[in-house]
From Swiss-Prot:
Biased composition (Basic residues): 138-151
Keyword Zinc carried by entry: yes
Name of the protein in its database record: PHD finger protein 23A
Localization: Nucleus; Cytoplasm
General function of this protein: Acts as a negative regulator of autophagy.
Length: 278
C-alpha cells in the first residue's frame, strides 16, 4: 500500500510541464561578440565597410534556452526529431529610433574625421590676424606723426585733418565741395588782417624766396614782405600789405594813402576810398 501511494501522484500537484512553462525565461547577458556585431552592422549600414553576405540582427539576442529542458526530458519520452537549420531571414530595416541613432553616430564620425577632431573654426584666427595688422598700422602712423612734429605739439586743425584721413569715408557720402581760389581770395580780402587772409595771400606769391626783398619789413604790421602783394603809399612811399590795407586784389586803387598819412592830412582834403565796392 505504501508503495502504491508513494508511486501515485497526487491530483493537487501540477505536472512538470506546467511548472517549466510558468517560470519566465532568463535573459542572457550581452557579450563582446554581440557588441562587435552591432558595430559591424552600423558601419555596414553607413557604408564604411562592405555589407557581409549573411547579416544577422546584432541587437536581437538568440532565443534563450530554458534550463529546465533537462528536467523535462525523461527516459520514457520519445526523442525529438532532428530539426533542419532554418533558412536565414532577410535583413529587416531597423526601427525609426535606431535609424536616428545610427545617423547621429555617422554624422559625428564624419565631422570628427573632416575637422581632425578640432571644434574651433579657423575664422577666429583670421579675425585675430586682421586686428593685429590694423593695430600695427596705427602704431606706425603714430610714430610718423611724432617724427614730423619734432617735439612741437600740433594744432587741433591738423589733428582733425589726420583723423579724417585715417577714418574711411562712409559709402554713399559725397565729398565736400571746394571753392575756387578766386572766390576764397575775394571773400578773405575784405576782412581783417587775420591768419586766414595771410594764407590766401600766400597762394599768390609772385617773387621767389631767393630775392633780397623777401625778408624786408616795411609794413606797420612788422611782418616781412615774403612775396605777398603790397601797395605803396603816395605820400611816404611806404609799402603796405594789401591784407593790412584791407584792399582786394581785384580793386586796387591808383592812389593810396597809408594810415599815418591819412591821419596827418588836412581834414578838408578828400581821400580816395580804398574799400570801394567792385
Amino acid at each position: 500500500m505504501l508503495e502504491t501511494t508513494m508511486g501515485e501522484a497526487s491530483p493537487e500537484d501540477p505536472p512538470l510541464n506546467l511548472k517549466s512553462l510558468s517560470q519566465p525565461p532568463q535573459k542572457r547577458s550581452r557579450t563582446v561578440e554581440d557588441f562587435n556585431r552591432f558595430c559591424s552592422f552600423v558601419l555596414a549600414y553607413a557604408g564604411y565597410i562592405p555589407t557581409p553576405a549573411k547579416e544577422e540582427r546584432a541587437w536581437t539576442p538568440p532565443s534563450s534556452v530554458s534550463p529546465h529542458r533537462t528536467e523535462e526530458s525523461d527516459g520514457w519520452d520519445s526523442p525529438d526529431p532532428p530539426q533542419l537549420p532554418a533558412p536565414p531571414e532577410p535583413p529587416q530595416p531597423p526601427a525609426t529610433s535606431d535609424i536616428s541613432t545610427i545617423e547621429t553616430f555617422v554624422m559625428k564620425a564624419k565631422s570628427q574625421g573632416a575637422g581632425g577632431g578640432s571644434s574651433k573654426m579657423p575664422g577666429g584666427q583670421e579675425d585675430g590676424a586682421e586686428e593685429e595688422e590694423v593695430q600695427a598700422k596705427k602704431g606706425s602712423r603714430r610714430k610718423r606723426r611724432q617724427r614730423h612734429r619734432g617735439g612741437v605739439r600740433m594744432s587741433d586743425t591738423d589733428t582733425d585733418e589726420e583723423e579724417r584721413e585715417e577714418r574711411p569715408a562712409a559709402p554713399g557720402s559725397l565729398p565736400a565741395p571746394q571753392l575756387p581760389p578766386s572766390a576764397e581770395s575775394s571773400r578773405d580780402g575784405g576782412g581783417s588782417s587775420s591768419d586766414a587772409d595771410t594764407q590766401v595771400m600766400d597762394e599768390d606769391i609772385m617773387v621767389e624766396s631767393g630775392d633780397d626783398s623777401w625778408d624786408l619789413v616795411t609794413c606797420y604790421c612788422e611782418k616781412p614782405f615774403a612775396g605777398r602783394p603790397m601797395i605803396e603809399c603816395n605820400v611816404c612811399c611806404t609799402w603796405v600789405h594789401l591784407s593790412c590795407a584791407k584792399i582786394r586784389k581785384s580793386n586796387v586803387p591808383d592812389v593810396y594813402y597809408c594810415q599815418k598819412c591819412r591821419a596827418g592830412r588836412l581834414p578838408g582834403a578828400t581821400t580816395p576810398k580804398a574799400d570801394s565796392a567792385p
